[in-house]
């Protein structure tokens, strides 16, 4: 595996196909809050304060001077109310950190904080930055999902595209939603309700097993709440196939129920990235290196199939096979998203979301990307693996892929 060389100033960027000499982007540490359910332990914490908790939790563990940070990049969806005004910058200042450090907020829908990590890695690889804090924050209890879109109704926009002549010319006025997309996926890949219920139940079972085994202990920072210290994800539920079978479909005549969907959640996550020069100058010990970052897109009507071509693209770019990947985190926005991906990519199901996914653990939108990244890193270390791959479906049909190599 690559090592940090005191004399190195640049290394070939793996998989770029051009032989360009660029610096490595090292993963120094990654943390997250436990995920709170809607109305749960984190519901009363202002989003700015929630983000500040993640930054503090990260930097307290890494013991780096906050003034050394070149930029703070945070993912957040529905940037209105307490999540407006560039929450990356506001939460950094709320944490008490230096005013001279800038911040920027990213919205790539559900993949926002995964994209934040990618932007941070790109800044380091290009040599324009040495230390980046990347992550995400979302309080869905305070700012409900799609708030930014529903606010537009007062200005005459019933959807982001309802008045776009060019959009209507290309896609018509058909429904564009994650619910329809999930149903279309289930239909195209012939996924039965019973299969999706079994998958969803497995997510809860794996999450409970991971919590009992302490798999998340090192990645979760403690949040002091009015009811005491908060350290355990609130989402996993004791369920059964019988209970799931009794639920009504999300749409009339559909196959999907609430049991197959990710949970509305609150949380924050943070990752520290550094160049090899910063590793040497600040005495840092990397846990991994960024091996590959990319994003691709697919049909916006199906919306959630992007991880399939995105994964193929990433594997082709790096020359890796799916069997070379030791652990995978793919966001469980809905059960059919992961199940279709498994059918197409032919990954070992045991390696995919081995500690449960968003169906059980929750999906705090803008924070989920860095949350999954954090869990992937911890799992790689736990099993002694080399490569981890993360991918997420996103609104509009896009998908990110990140591959890391454990050091």
Swiss-Prot record:
Enzyme Commission identifier(s): 2.3.1.16
Binding site for substrate: 395
GO function terms (MF aspect): acetyl-CoA C-acyltransferase activity
Residues annotated as the enzyme's active site: 110 (acyl-thioester intermediate), 363 (proton acceptor), 393 (proton acceptor)
Major enzyme class: transferase
UniProt: CoA binding residues: 178, 237-239, 262
CDD domains: thiolase
Pathway(s) the chain acts in: Steroid metabolism; cholesterol degradation
Catalytic activity: an acyl-CoA + acetyl-CoA = a 3-oxoacyl-CoA + CoA; 6-methyl-3,7-dioxodecanedioyl-CoA + CoA = 4-methyl-5-oxo-octanedioyl-CoA + acetyl-CoA
Keywords of the record: Acyltransferase, Cholesterol metabolism, Lipid metabolism, Steroid metabolism, Sterol metabolism, Transferase
Domain of life from the UniProt record: Bacteria
GO BP, sorted A to Z: cholesterol catabolic process
Note, other: Turnover of MeDODA-CoA is low and FadA6 may not be the physiological thiolase responsible for MOODA-CoA formation.
NCBIfam families, per database record: AcCoA-C-Actrans, PRK07801.1
Family: Belongs to the thiolase-like superfamily. Thiolase family.
Its job: May be involved in the final steps of cholesterol and steroid degradation. Catalyzes the formation of 4-methyl-5-oxo-octanedioyl-CoA (MOODA-CoA) and acetyl-CoA from 6-methyl-3,7-dioxodecanedioyl-CoA (MeDODA-CoA) and coenzyme A.
This protein's name: Steroid 3-ketoacyl-CoA thiolase FadA6
């Amino acid at each position: 595996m690559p090592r940090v060389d005191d004399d190195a100033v640049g290394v070939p960027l793996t998989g770029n196909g051009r032989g360009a000499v660029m610096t490595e982007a090292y993963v120094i540490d990654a943390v997250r809050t436990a995920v709170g359910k809607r109305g749960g332990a984190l519901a009363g914490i202002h989003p700015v304060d929630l983000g500040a908790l993640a930054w503090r939790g990260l930097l307290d563990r890494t013991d780096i001077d906050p003034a050394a940070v070149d930029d703070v990049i945070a993912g957040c969806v529905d940037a209105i109310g307490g999540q407006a005004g560039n929450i990356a910058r506001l939460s950094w200042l709320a944490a008490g950190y230096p005013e001279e450090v800038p911040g920027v907020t990213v919205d790539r829908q559900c993949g926002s904080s995964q994209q934040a990590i990618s932007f941070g890695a790109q800044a380091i690889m290009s040599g324009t930055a040495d230390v980046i804090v990347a992550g995400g924050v979302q309080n869905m209890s305070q700012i409900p999902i799609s708030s930014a879109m529903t606010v537009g109704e007062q200005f005459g926009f019933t959807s982001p595209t309802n008045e776009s002549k060019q959009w209507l010319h290309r896609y018509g006025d058909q429904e564009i939603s994650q619910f329809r997309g999930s149903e279309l996926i289930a239909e195209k890949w012939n996924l039965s309700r019973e299969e999706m219920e079994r998958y969803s139940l497995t997510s809860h079972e794996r999450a409970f097993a991971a919590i009992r085994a302490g798999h998340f202990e090192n990645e979760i920072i403690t949040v002091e709440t009015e009811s005491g210290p908060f350290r355990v994800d609130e989402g996993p539920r004791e369920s059964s196939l019988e209970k799931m079978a009794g639920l009504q479909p999300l749409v009339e005549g559909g196959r999907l129920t609430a049991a197959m969907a990710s949970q509305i959640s609150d949380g924050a996550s943070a990752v520290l990235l550094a160049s090899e020069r910063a590793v040497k100058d600040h005495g840092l010990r990397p846990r991994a290196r960024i091996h590959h970052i990319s994003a691709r897109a697919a049909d916006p009507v199906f919306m959630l199939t992007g991880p399939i071509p995105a994964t193929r693209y990433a594997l082709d770019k790096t020359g890796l096979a799916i069997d070379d990947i030791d652990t995978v985190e793919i966001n469980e926005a809905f059960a059919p998203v992961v199940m279709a991906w498994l059918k197409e990519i032919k990954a070992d199901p045991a390696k995919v979301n081995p500690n449960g996914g968003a169906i059980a653990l929750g999906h705090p939108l803008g924070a989920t990307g860095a949350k999954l990244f954090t869990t992937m890193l911890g799992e790689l270390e736990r099993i002694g693996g080399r490569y981890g791959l993360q991918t997420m479906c996103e609104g509009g049909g896009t998908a990110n892929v990140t591959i890391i190599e454990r050091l």
